[in-house]
Regions:
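Alpha/beta-hydrolase fold catalytic core
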Residues: 1-45, 68, 287-289
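Conserved HGGG/HGGXW glycine-rich cap/lid loop of the alpha/beta-hydrolase fold
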Residues: 25-83
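Active-site loop/oxyanion-hole signature of alpha/beta-hydrolase fold enzymes
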Residues: 60-63, 72-115, 119, 280
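Catalytic histidine-centered segment of alpha/beta-hydrolase-like enzymes
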Residues: 263-276
Length: 289
């Protein structure tokens, strides 16, 4: 998530109704409860958010998608209205998304497209290996890092873990947005003053474990995803960091039924900054999936 992305996330989440309960709670394979927030009418689809966020990050695109879909936005485990079970493994997140898709499929008796942003896209792809309830996947810059491409900063992951273990979640979140997102002092001050800050602090402990899990995935994650048989649309921001493009291309090379769409001018948060272009890509893809 870059600085523009996080700024947009703050604004979107602050304007969202963060006090309402989930429409349903789904039990995952390990017993963890996953909160699902549902709006709209029409064919079902599931939204899966990325790191340092919750379901409110889809405040901009969610209502627009809900004009023609029944939108089921989840809180991933460890935050918001979802539970958590240790030890953490990214595979449990795959199971969470699969469980939600199966619950929605049971209610609507149809296949369910899953749309995931960043780490949420990785979770959506992994879930597609577990269930035929997922009919298609839209992944926004969530492909595993290919061999030879450095993912993040291992020292930073250790530093964030130490802050978590020291019981300093606010400092953890600030370190993440400063060093990974690139937010400056003024941006951090505004973020801390925003109503969404406590929600993000409460979920800050999930950041280092996700950085570590993604960093360890690498080539093994890419090779496993070669078995995904559902149609997969990967969406890439035209102005995103080069490593996102490299990961997207590496995954597309392995997929049997993959497509790439590039949104000109977008970076890592087109769901905030270029919602119309993103929704157009989703609609076009799902019409042919």
């Amino acid at each position: 998530m870059d600085a523009d992305a996080l700024s947009a996330d703050v604004s979107a989440a602050a304007s969202a109704d963060v006090g309402g309960p989930p429409a349903r709670v789904v039990t995952s394979a390990d017993g963890t409860l996953i909160g699902v927030f549902t709006t709209g009418q029409g064919p079902p689809l599931v939204l899966v958010h990325g790191a340092a966020a919750d379901h409110t990050t889809f405040r901009v695109v969610g209502p627009r998608l809900a004009q023609r879909y029944t939108v089921h936005a989840i809180d991933r485990r460890g935050r918001g209205d979802s539970g958590d079970t240790l030890p953490y493994a990214i595979e449990r997140e795959f199971e969470d998304v699969a469980a939600v898709a199966e619950a929605v499929r049971d209610a609507d008796t149809s296949g369910v497209p899953v749309i995931g942003h960043s780490y949420g896209g990785r979770c959506a792809l992994g879930a597609a290996l577990l269930t035929d309830a997922i009919s298609a996947v839209v992944c926004y810059e969530g492909a595993p890092t290919p061999p030879g491409v450095e993912y993040g900063d291992a020292a930073l992951a250790d530093e964030l873990t130490a802050l978590d273990e020291a019981g300093r979640p606010a400092d953890l979140l600030e370190a993440f947005v400063r060093r990974v997102v690139g937010m400056d002092d003024a941006g951090i001050a505004a973020y801390r003053a925003d109503p969404v800050w406590p929600r993000r602090v409460a979920a800050a402990h999930t950041i280092p474990r996700e950085l570590l899990a993604e960093g360890r995935s690498g080539a093994a994650g890419l090779d496993a995803l070669a078995r995904v048989g559902q149609p997969v649309l990967q969406v890439l921001g035209g102005d995103s960091k080069p490593e996102f493009g490299e990961a997207t291309a590496a995954l597309d090379d392995r997929l049997a039924n993959g497509t790439i769409v590039v949104i000109p001018g977008a970076r890592h948060a087109a769901h905030h900054t270029h919602p119309d272009a993103l929704i157009e890509a989703i609609d076009t893809f799902l019409a042919g999936a």
